[in-house]
Amino acid sequence: MTLIDSHRPEIASKHVVARDFGAASDSYDCAARLQRHMGERLLAQLPRTLSASKVLDLGCGTGQFVPALSERYPQARVTGVDLSAAMVAHARRQRAGDYQWLVADAERLPLASGSVDAVFSNLMIQWCTDPRPVLAECLRVLRPGGMLVCSTLVQGTLRELAAAWQQVDPGVDHVNRFEAWPALLEQVMAVAPQAAVEQETVTLPYESPMQLLAELKSLGAQYKGGARRKTVTAPGRLRRLAQQYPRRDGEVLASYEAAYITYRRQD
């Protein structure tokens, strides 16, 4: 048995993912601290010297990084791609500029092979059942010499929140589970053996667990597993969560285990 087969996290359907993120389009940018941090690091991995006439932001959401990609490659046509039509509509309204927008499934991009110079994908593939088809599709559309930079989350993300919930509501999942680091490495190497993969722990402070939960909802990143409760969480359960969540210097901390993938297609 491969690492990939062991304890695969349950992922919501594409419809649920698109619905949740679309519903969060108006609140997303104000809450997207992690997305900004990871996206800026990802952007820095794209060399300005790359000759680029066509750039994709895959899983663009509200189009937060589309202007930055355009500034980095002023001669390029930048296209924001997202599964959520609501997100793409929001991005089109909010981002003034000569950009293109596309509603599409990352596993089946309506683009010619070898037609793109750079693919930028920030915090998208963790919502895929299996990242390998998406990575393979990214490599398919890359031109020789083109680059893929991609970020995702791995196991251990929001571990403080998960531990607190298990004290309050044992045996019930409340936090999304992500692929283990060794499994992600195996998946990436299966598609792109020359890729570089790096890991970073990002820790963000919050005033309370309630602020953390509100931020996740504002991002459309609330728990998506099939076992989630179908009713509103009782106030008493939330109070117990606040009591169980560890505090440091009056605030609570949330850890995110980030992974960054960089690949350059050989000429």
Spell out what each predicted region is.
Residues 33-52, 68:
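Conserved alpha-helix/loop element of class I SAM-dependent methyltransferases that forms part
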Residues 54-108:
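Class I SAM-dependent methyltransferase SAM/SAH-binding core
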Residues 62-64, 196-267:
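Conserved Class I S-adenosyl-L-methionine
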Residues 4-37:
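Class I SAM-dependent methyltransferase Rossmann-like catalytic core
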Residues 118-130:
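A short SAM/SAH-binding and catalytic strip from SAM-dependent methyltransferases
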Residues 132-144:
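A short glycine-rich, Lys/Arg-flanked "PGG" loop and its adjoining helix->strand segment in the class I
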Residues 132, 147-211, 222-232:
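Conserved catalytic/acceptor-binding region of the Class I
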Residues 107-118:
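A short acidic, Gly/Pro-enriched loop at the edge of an enzyme's catalytic core
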